[in-house]
Each structure stands twice: as structure tokens, then as C-alpha cells.
UniProtKB/Swiss-Prot annotation:
Function statement: Catalyzes the hydrolysis of 2-hydroxy-6-oxohepta-2,4-dienoate into 2-hydroxypenta-2,4-dienoate and acetate.
EC number: 3.7.1.25
Protein name as annotated: 2-hydroxy-6-oxo-2,4-heptadienoate hydrolase
Cited Gene3D superfamilies: alpha/beta hydrolase
Keywords recorded for this protein, A-Z: Aromatic hydrocarbons catabolism, Hydrolase, Serine esterase
GO molecular function: 2-hydroxy-6-oxohepta-2,4-dienoate hydrolase activity; carboxylic ester hydrolase activity
Family indicated by similarity: Belongs to the DmpD/TodF/XylF esterase family.
Keyword Hydrolase tagged: yes
GO CC annotation: membrane
Segments forming domain AB hydrolase-1: 28-259
Lineage: Bacteria, Pseudomonadati, Pseudomonadota, Gammaproteobacteria, Pseudomonadales
Pathway(s) where this gene product acts: Xenobiotic degradation; toluene degradation
Length: 276
């Protein structure tokens, strides 16, 4: 009997990088850009929302370079420019001129940077618990980026993610720990955000003026009780992006798409269904 790993979709060559992505549904394309948790994959990030979102549109969820089952090129320098270039390469490989972007946390910073650099290739933006502006490094984000593989450390990271700690079972912590120790995963992850880590928050941030210049309709989502990316970042983005709306979920941490699954799907579906 074949053991099929649901985290592996199909491979495309994007900007010279063998890229694992999930491509489901039909219609207007939306690209889901995952966060930067240890052992993360697009599937792990978006599995709870892809079935519903893909009922009405084409949903593409790639593993960004350095993460998941996408190739890790020898000698690559991980940073905003390389990740944005990879995202552009994914769109080119799929022959997509213009897409909606949904970015989670680190993926929000990449989506924002992509919209600034390639405004003609983005229709609408959704930013969820996004980085994108500078803030003082939180204990939660320091724990995420400073993760060293062990089950207790993975549980600590996941406790920071969740408002409802009952979601963080021993089984889930063990599962994600195993994911973080797959060949090549931790080596690439450890090279991305070495201490001191405030500099990586600042490096992922776009300038206030560049953000002010964004003209895309933007939906900003955040958990009120987020201990990884502070709510103030989304308040700031809402102030800077003139055509934006902000929704704050109470009793919710950094896992908006999991802890407020139905609300996330409803808001994103309604927002992306609107005509410009």
C-alpha cells in the first residue's frame, strides 16, 4: 500500500526552482502564502480552508523556497527579494498575469512586498497576522524563529500560536516536530533568522511610503490575542493602506484560519467575490 503524503501536491519549475504547490478549483486565481513556523508547509498552513475557498475559485498554495518540499538551492540567500522573485516565478510558471494574494504572518510580508514591486500582478490583498511593518520582536516570534528541534520546544512554539491551548495536543506537537526534522528542513530554517532576530523583523518590513502607495483593496485580519505578531501591526497597516478594512477576532491567537475558521472563510470569500 502506497503511503501518500498530503503535503506534496505537484512540482513546477518556478524561476529555476523545483516548487511544490497545491492547485485546486477553477476560476479567478488566488495564491495563499504560508507563514514561517518550523516545519511549515503550504498544506499544513492552509488545509482547513482550501476546500471551501476552492469551491468558488482556483486556489494555489506553494511551498516557498526554503520551506516544505520545494527545492533548497545551494548557496541561496534567503530574504525578501529572493522570496518575492520566487513568487513571481510561480505566477510565470502557471502563466498567471494577475492574482489575489492571501498572506499569513511572514507570508503577509511577502504578499505586501510583492504588491509593492508588481502592483499590476495583484488584484486584491488579504493580510492575516501579517508582518510588513516593523515592531519590537515578541517573545513568541523569537521562540518561533529560534526553534531548535525537540517535542517540548515544538509544543512551546504552538502554545504561542494558539489562544485555545487545548488545540495543542501531544499528538499534534509530535507530528509537527517530526515535520520539522525532515531532511533539510531545519538546516534551511535555522539559516533564515539567526539571532539577533530584531533585524529580520525590520528586513521583512516595507517602508511606510511604499505601503501608503498601495492602491489594492485590502482585507486585514488579526487575532486580538496574538502573542507572535502584535495586533498593533495590523492597526498600523490599516492606517497606512487607504483602501483597507480591518477585522479583529476576539478569543483568537496567531491561528486565525484555524481558531476562527468559519469567520476567516466567510470574510475572505466575500471579499474576493467582490468586483473592483
Amino acid at each position: 500500500m502506497t503511503n501518500v503524503n498530503a503535503e506534496i501536491g505537484r512540482m513546477v519549475l518556478a524561476g529555476g526552482i523545483e516548487t511544490n504547490l497545491h492547485d485546486v478549483g477553477a476560476g479567478n486565481p488566488v495564491v495563499l502564502v504560508h507563514g514561517s513556523g518550523p516545519g511549515v508547509t503550504a498544506w499544513a498552513n492552509w488545509r482547513t480552508v482550501m476546500p471551501e475557498l476552492s469551491r468558488h475559485r482556483r486556489v494555489i498554495a506553494p511551498d516557498m523556497v526554503g520551506f516544505g518540499f520545494t527545492q533548497r538551492p545551494h548557496g541561496i540567500h534567503y530574504g525578501v527579494e529572493s522570496w518575492v522573485a520566487h513568487l513571481a516565478g510561480i505566477l510565470d510558471a502557471l502563466e498567471l498575469d494577475r492574482v489575489d494574494l492571501v498572506g499569513n504572518s511572514f507570508g503577509g510580508a511577502l504578499s505586501l512586498a510583492f504588491a509593492i514591486r508588481f502592483p499590476h500582478r495583484v488584484r486584491r490583498l488579504v493580510l492575516m497576522g501579517a508582518v510588513g511593518v516593523s515592531f519590537e520582536l515578541t517573545d513568541g516570534l523569537d521562540a518561533v524563529w529560534g526553534y531548535e528541534p525537540s517535542v517540548p520546544n515544538m509544543r512551546k512554539v504552538m502554545d504561542y500560536f494558539a489562544y485555545d491551548r487545548s488545540l495543542v495536543s501531544d499528538e499534534l506537537a509530535e507530528l509537527r516536530y517530526k515535520a520539522s526534522t525532515r531532511p533539510g528542513f531545519q538546516e534551511a530554517f535555522a539559516s533564515m533568522f539567526p539571532a539577533p532576530r530584531q533585524r529580520w523583523v525590520d528586513a521583512l518590513a516595507s517602508s511606510d511610503q511604499d505601503i501608503r502607495d498601495i492602491r489594492h483593496e485590502t482585507l486585514i485580519l488579526h487575532g486580538r490575542d496574538d502573542r507572535v505578531i502584535p495586533l498593533e501591526t495590523s492597526l498600523r497597516l490599516n492606517q497606512l493602506i487607504e483602501p483597507s478594512q480591518l477585522h479583529v477576532f476576539g478569543r483568537c491567537g496567531h491561528w486565525v484560519q484555524i481558531e476562527q475558521n468559519r469567520g476567516f472563510i466567510r470574510l475572505v470569500n466575500d471579499f474576493l467575490a467582490a468586483e473592483d
